[in-house]
Each structure stands twice: as C-alpha cells, then as structure tokens.
Amino acid sequence: MAVSARPARAPRGSDKVKKDKAAQTSGPRQGSRMGKLLGFEWTDVSSWERLVTLLNRPTDPAGLAVFRFLFGLMMVLDIPQERGLSSLDRRYLDGLEVCRFPLLDALQPLPLDWMYLIYTIMFLGALGMMLGLCYRISCVLFLLPYWYVFLLDKTSWNNHSYLYGLLAFQLTFVDAHHYWSVDGLLRARKRNAHVPLWNYAVLRGQIFIVYFIAGIKKLDADWVEGYSMEYLSRHWLFSPFKLVLSEEMTSLLVVHWCGLLLDLSAGFLLFFDASRPIGFVFVSYFHCMNSQLFSIGMFPYVMLASSPLFCSPEWPRKLVAHCPKKLQELLPLRTAPQPSTSCMYKRSRARGSQKPGLRHKLSTAFTLLYLLEQLFLPYSHFLTQGYNNWTNGLYGYSWDMMVHSRSHQHVKITYRDGRTGELGYLNPGVFTQSRRWKDHADMLKQYATCLSRLLPKYNVTEPQIYFDIWVSINDRFQQRIFDPRVDIVQAAWSPFQRTPWLQPLLMDLSPWRTKLQEIKSSLDNHTEVVFIADFPGLHLENFVSEDLGNTSIQLLQGEVTVELVAEQKNQTLQEGEKMQLPAGEYHKVYTVSSSPSCYMYIYVNTTEVALEQDLAYLQELKEKVENGSETGPLPPELQPLLEGEVKGGPEPTPLVQTFLRRQQRLQEIERRRNAPFHERLVRFLLRKLFIFRRSFLMTCISLRNLAFGRPSLEQLAQEVTYANLRPFEPAGEPSPVNTDSSNPNPPEPDSHPVHSEF
C-alpha cells in the first residue's frame, strides 16, 4: 500500500513543478540586477540552508546530457589514440626490460593480455557513459582503469589527460543520465527528470578554473615577455596576422598576450549571458587553432564540448524545436522535465518549504570542497617539494600549459662499477620508452634505481649512476639541471623535501636573452651557435665532430680554462676572448671564476655546407639540361639526374643518390601540400581507421588468449602481422614512419664513451 501511494502523489507534485517550471529551473523569480547577472540572489547564499537549497534547485537535464554524450564520445576516440590502445603491445610487451615511471613504485603493469582487458573495460565504460547505459557502473568502469593507466606512467602526464580524469570523476556523481540516455528509456523515473543545480555548478567551476588558473600561470615573466612559445608564430595559422605585424610582434602580441588575455577572460565571458556569444567565438577559434598547432588529442574538442555547459540548461530543447518535425521524433524530448528526488522544490506557503535532507547537504559539501581543492592544488607545491624542479610540481595538475619550453643540448650517463671502479657510459634513454625523465628529479631517481637493478646482468656490480644533463628553458643559456658529481642511486630524495642535488636555475642570467638573440641574428645561415652557462668548480667535456671544421669558443662572462686533451694544452679565457678548437678531438672547459661562467660555441658544419653546394650545382645542371641551355652530353654517372635510377644502368654516385632522394622527398611534400581537400581527408581517415583496426584486432587476440590460452608463437606472429597490415591505403601511398616512442627492444648498454657532438 505504501508503495502504491507514492506514485499517487507524484502527479500533483509534477503538475506543481510544471506550473512553476520557469521559477524553479531558471533562477530567481524577481528580476533583480544580481539575479539577472549571476542567476541567484544574495539571500540564496546568506546561510548554509539557503545555499543547500540553491545548489539543489531543480534544473533542466538537457545541457548536462549533451555534454555527457560528447565527453563519452571523445573518450571512446581517445582510448585507441592518446591512451595508447593501438600500441599497447609495444609499451607493455611481456618480458621487456624497461624502466618505468609510476607515481608509486608499487604500481606495476599487468601482463600484456590483462592490460588489454583493462583497456577493454575502460573502452566499454566510455561507451556506456556516452549512451547513458548502466550509467553509474559505466562511469566507474571507465574511471578506475583510466586512473590506473594514468598513474602508471608519469612520463605521459599532461594537463588535459589529468582534466579527463577529473571530468569523469565528476560525471560519476552527477545525474547526466536523466535525459537522452538508454537508462531513461528503460526506467521511467530517470527519463527526462530534473537534476540539481550543483551538477552544472561543479562542471562549470572546473572549466572556469582550467581557464583562469592557466591565465594566472601565464602572468609569468617569460610568457609576458614572449619567450615561452617564441617559434609558434612561424606556423601558417598566423599568416593573416603577419600581413600587418612582424613575426616577432606576432609572437609577442598574438601568441603570448592574446593567449594570456583569453585564458584570464574566457571563464567570465562564458559565464555571463551578455558576453557569452563573444566568448564562444574566441574560445572556439582558440581551440580550433590548438587542434592544428599541437598534438594534444581530443583536448580541443573536449573543451569545445564543455562550452555549452555555460548556456541555459534547456538549450538542446530549443534547438530540437527548430528541427523538422520528422527529425524531432529521433531527437531528445522537448517536453518539460519531471520531478526528481535529487532536487529540492519550492512548495506553497501553506505547506512550507522543503527541508534539505542529508543527501542535499552532502552534495553541497562535495561541490564546495571539490572546487576549493581544485583552487588549492595548483599552488600546493610547497607540500610536495620533491617534485619541484625548475618548474613547480609534476607537470599535469598545475594548468601551466605551454608556459615552459625546453631544449636539451647534452645528456651523459656515467656508471661506475662499485667493486672495480671501472667507468663506462650509457646511451641516454637506454631501457626507457620516454625522454621526459631528463627534467624531473623523481623520475631520475627511479631511472637510476632501475639501472642499478639491470646493469648487474651486464657484469657491472654495485653500479653507481651519474647524470650530466644540460637544459635550456625558455631560450636561456644551456646549463646543468642536476649535480653531475652525485651518485643518484644513493642520493636522497623525498616527495616532501627539496631535492639537494638539483642545481638552481640561473635567473640572474635571464637578461642575457636579448643579447643572445642579437648574436644569433648577426650570424650567417651556415653558422650555428650554442650558449653555455656553468657553475664554479665544474667542467664540461665535449667532442668536436670532424664535420665541424670551423669551431671556436668565446667567453661572455666569468673565467674558464680550456684543456685540449690530445695536445695536453691549457688556455685560460677572460671575458670577450675566444680560441679555435680542433675538430675530431676532445676538450674540457673548466669554470675557474667564483661566479658562473657564460660562453658560446660558434661553429660551421663544413661537410654540410659542401654538400649543399654540390646539391645546388646538380639542381642547376638538371635545370640547364631541361631548358636546353646545357647542350653537352652528361657523363654516365649523372644520367640518373634526368632519367632516375635504371636497373642495369650505370651506378649513380653517392652524391647523385642523395640528390635523387631529396628530390623525391621534396616532390612528395609538394604533392601532399597541393593535394585537394578530399584527398587529404581520405588520408586522414585511413590513418585513423588503421589505429582503430589495429586496436580492435590486438584486443581480440589478447581476450582470446585469456579465454582459451595462447596459441603457438607462429600463429601469434601471423595474427600480429595481419593486425599491422594497412589494407585500406591506396597503392603507392607510403606508410607513415612509426613515431611511437616506445621501443620493444631497447639497446643494450654501450660501454663506449658517449658525449655530445654539435
């Protein structure tokens, strides 16, 4: 009887809600200035109970459901691509000797077939989230594997991958399946039911924080002065701006200053009704540009999908109302939402106001605590000082997007046998699948610990590991980031204490960047320069390649002593002095001043210059023959210039072969550049089709292995070969080079010295 009585009261509540729909779902009834501007009155937040009532106000679920669908779709597309399902066998091949970088050392990947199962669960969770099918379960099925894979590899961390995990976490708790969902079709109580306002507030707050904190981080002096993304203005997307601005001013005004202003203002522009159309234009243009400028996967499209969250929640119904009637039958409902137990409704004066329950209070507390935590985390680096390097914290949760750009000039890994004292050198990055360990003390410690476990297999006992890593950040001098005299295996490191073997960034030398740019611009096209800064008491050992026939070193600041190893000669340089360095030999540069030294290498690759001259001569000769100005016969070894390589014909010289390969490359680039849009679209779709095809086939193979056991190695090899086929590519289309950073067979340690060469 009690169960049957409940539905009997529902229609009366439903009728009341429909009558007061405008008042309950669109904000305050009174058209006060604050109500029109913010959507609520000051009295709505004047007490805890009123705040609970506000955040649990019934709201149209339509806009939330559209975001749920689009976000789920983006994750379905993201898993085979940026999450790495298509290349999972290269990263987690069973028996692969590789150093990994999880957040916690206890986190380790499962066997390969089980990793495919984890990814399958994540994919099905994203699909269920998109469709609103078993919604809560689907969100959990996506969320748990996603964070497991995310925490498994710090080298792949970035801001947008972190954001995906946060959005999925929020969607797990909100009622995004109350509209346009399979759950709504199966359960009448969920179909087209109100959602509380906090569902929108927490998502809007998250997106607002992403924009605004990113803008605050861009107030960094390097960004404001235009050093962070200095070379971005060379991209063709900025060509319209360069019609009226120089490349330098385009970089400063458009890339840096406009990027700063957009991030600071985007959240506000989207929040207020009057400015929202302007915000939509700028934000959409910004993310469309980013999709072409950077390889950041689904991030621009996720941010585009999040923008309508700031619109009136019923915007999808208004859009459906403008569609043809026949099409409306296939689209989401237009009818008014039904009541939901998740919301608090205003009642008549006689009955009094609805009292907030425990559920409503907990949801309000969750919203406030979550947003406060998100405001705190980007500035929590004073707690996790072990992750602070030249930039604060692990790259990923600080929203300091694109603020810091790095270049690495020199990386040397030295090992010492703890028993014999024998020295040796390792190829930088051996036993790894990433290069990001170079900039982070925590990853360097993990790498050194891993090497100390692996090197005994190569007859190196009790190994000591030393790293000499030179980095330039935002066009500063190349300088050491870690102390090369410290054995990192035994070095102390804690996530909550400052890393003692981290070298400071020489901020006092930042004003030199203007002078360095002037020096670069004064050099001709064939002359290169590298700017170095080093600490007192340290030295740089370097090797000048035989190709660099004209190399010199010039001191800019401090005092150094240059040792020519082969000649056993030393020469001390004062500020402004320079000396020639012999090619094909080692030298050492000692900083003997009490302050850091600054110097530069100036060099010309004479071999490359000679090659360019020879290739230019062959190009000129080919053009003369083709236009008839060259009447004499070509020597047999130069005939391929006109006819290409012919089987059975004369063997072209290495120079001619190089010329022909370059011509072929240039022709291919020109062909692709001038290809019609439909051809480029087909090529793009075929690449994506291969990624999804390989992901599907490799997943099927692994799930079969788990269910029925692994077949013979011969059969597995045939199946993987079939998965690697590109059957849909047009004939003659070259397969793209595998740019996957993972290497299933990393090289063994090299016992020969490895030094940087210019």
From Swiss-Prot:
Keywords tagged on the record: Acetylation, Disulfide bond, Endoplasmic reticulum, Lyase, Membrane, Transmembrane, Transmembrane helix
Sequence ranges of Basic and acidic residues compositional bias: 12-22, 749-758
Lumenal side: 82-113, 158-292, 385-758
SUPFAM superfamilies associated with the record: RmlC-like cupins (SSF51182)
Pfam families reported in the protein's UniProt record: HTTM, VKGC_lumenal_dom
Reaction(s) catalysed by this chain's protein: 4-carboxy-L-glutamyl-[protein] + 2,3-epoxyphylloquinone + H2O + H(+) = phylloquinol + L-glutamyl-[protein] + CO2 + O2
Keyword Endoplasmic reticulum: yes
Disulfide bridge map: C99-C450
Assembly and interaction partners: Monomer. May interact with CALU.
UniProt name for this protein: Vitamin K-dependent gamma-carboxylase
Native source species: Bos taurus (Bovine)
